[in-house]
A protein has these predicted regions:
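Cleaved targeting-peptide boundary
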Residues: 2-4
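Surface-exposed molecular-recognition determinants
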Residues: 8-20, 30-40, 44-228
Length: 228
């Protein structure tokens, strides 16, 4: 039987719509068809997929405290990005705290964390620093304070490097934007922290808490970072 060339006007969409839909992210070896200057070619999905792989997310409402994620760190990836978007506590002037979790348990014993940060704000030239050597959490945000106004939410990235490692302390570093209670003064904060109780602890999750009340709005997205 002679082959017939399919042209734009003679292509029946049912060729695609009538086929079983893929209900997940394509595997790296799945193939797609593209047009390269008019020439059809096939390409493995691995060449075009993002290096950020969605793992989990939550949109916060009400008065949530703590916000917990279990089983989000695994041997599949050794780097993770936690994206915070307009995270707002219920009340002003509260500390926002990060803790690792091991299975279903929060790692929160005294004198097991250390953290350091520096920040600047839009109405001052001075740099504010915060450093703590023995704590039960990692405080994040400018002067460790969060504010409740929608224009004052915490946004930015927390980077988690190799949390499943048993040869280094579980640690984070972050780059965040916050603001004062009315949202007019912007704060930029960078910092780092580590759980230093045991090198052999392979953490599997984390939680964010407020020193009082909880979070009323905002979003947290977790991505695994594929190695290039």
């Amino acid at each position: 039987m002679a082959q017939t060339k399919i042209k734009a006007g003679g292509f029946d969409p049912d060729v695609i719509t009538g086929t079983t839909a893929l209900a997940a992210v394509p595997a790296s070896t799945d193939e797609l068809i593209i047009s390269d200057a008019g020439t059809l070619k096939r390409i493995d999905f691995t060449h075009i997929q993002s290096h950020l792989v969605p793992i989990s997310s939550v949109a916060l409402t009400g008065n949530t405290n703590p916000v917990r994620f279990d089983d989000v760190f695994s041997a599949t990836y050794n780097k993770y990005q936690l994206i915070l978007t307009d995270l707002c506590p219920q009340t002003d002037d509260v500390s926002v705290r990060f803790r690792f979790r091991d299975g279903s348990s929060t790692l929160e014993a005294s004198n097991t964390y250390e953290h350091v940060s520096f920040g600047v704000q839009s109405d001052e030239n001075d740099t504010t620093t915060l450093s703590t050597n023995n704590d039960d959490n990692i405080q994040i945000g400018h002067k460790a304070l969060g504010h409740s106004a929608a224009t004052s939410g915490i946004s930015g990235i927390i980077f988690v490097n190799d949390p499943q490692s048993t040869s280094n302390y579980a640690n984070i570093h972050y780059d965040l934007k916050t603001a004062d209670g009315d949202g007019f003064t912007l704060y930029k904060t960078s910092g780092a922290g580590a759980y230093k109780h045991a090198v052999s602890t392979a953490v599997e999750g984390f939680e964010l808490t407020c020193s009082s009340n909880g979070f009323t709005s905002g979003r947290i997205d977790i991505f695994g970072v594929k190695n290039a």
